[in-house]
Amino acid sequence: MRIYSLIDSQTLMTKGFASEVMRSPEPPKKWDIAKKKGGMRTIYHPSSKVKLIQYWLMNNVFSKLPMHNAAYAFVKNRSIKSNALLHAESKNKYYVKIDLKDFFPSIKFTDFEYAFTRYRDRIEFTTEYDKELLQLIKTICFISDSTLPIGFPTSPLIANFVARELDEKLTQKLNAIDKLNATYTRYADDIIVSTNMKGASKLILDCFKRTMKEIGPDFKINIKKFKICSASGGSIVVTGLKVCHDFHITLHRSMKDKIRLHLSLLSKGILKDEDHNKLSGYIAYAKDIDPHFYTKLNRKYFQEIKWIQNLHNKVE
């Protein structure tokens, strides 16, 4: 049985569906969106037929491939909160923030292929279908120049798998630096290294630069976003969340102000209808990230919060 027949049977599609999509896949839709700090980002959206095969690959192939414990984005039961919490619980005072430039597009199919050869035994049918499977992944999950596109549902899993080598080597090298005792996490392209060693930023950056030269993917540091921060007497922002001087996690001030403003407008009966769902999401977000802040909000805006939550439940 060819791999295409396997996909047809397991997705309950008609015979020949997968091979037909493979022969002439419908090109993805694409559009450009502006980045916050200038430039454009291209987003790709696969056709429904291609997406069906992508989900089959996610369930039967990519979900079985390992990723490093330091990876926190696109991982079940992990979030921006658990990422920030790990650094907060380490009680480290000094933070180095490193952004990987063009993270998804810097990953090529050859990078995936190289990593896949190390772990192919985890997939039950790879021995029989190796070449077919790799060709399918190249055609269905990568775009014409063999780069990993932003927007495909398969891209996050592939990216975490390919970046495993980076995470592994960086963790080993950082652990080998005497007295550094660093905590390392990666949330997609956003890397945080925290430590209690003052003045360690050069050591950490040199470690990164050496490691980048040793691995397959062409990852590059975005120097414009490189930051060194200290929690002494203040707070640090980790993946959008605030790590306070007493090491508890809370929302950024701007988000708190936005929630208060929306609740105030609701209490006065002038919150726009289209903002009701936004407020419901903000409240759920606040409750998850900082229950203490949510409790304070609830004391002041109990009726408003109850009303917006009931409205959300009716919609569901």
Swiss-Prot record:
One GO BP: defense response to virus
EC main group: transferase
EC number, as in UniProt: 2.7.7.49
Keywords annotated in UniProt: Antiviral defense, Magnesium, Metal-binding, Nucleotidyltransferase, RNA-binding, RNA-directed DNA polymerase, Transferase
An annotated Gene Ontology molecular function: RNA-directed DNA polymerase activity
Keyword Nucleotidyltransferase in annotation: yes
Domain notes: The C-terminal domain (residue 247-316) is required to recognize RNA.
PANTHER family: NUCLEAR INTRON MATURASE 1, MITOCHONDRIAL-RELATED, RNA-DIRECTED DNA POLYMERASE
Protein family per UniProt: Belongs to the bacterial reverse transcriptase family.
Record protein name field: Retron Ec73 reverse transcriptase
UniProt organism field: Escherichia coli
Gene this chain is encoded by: ret
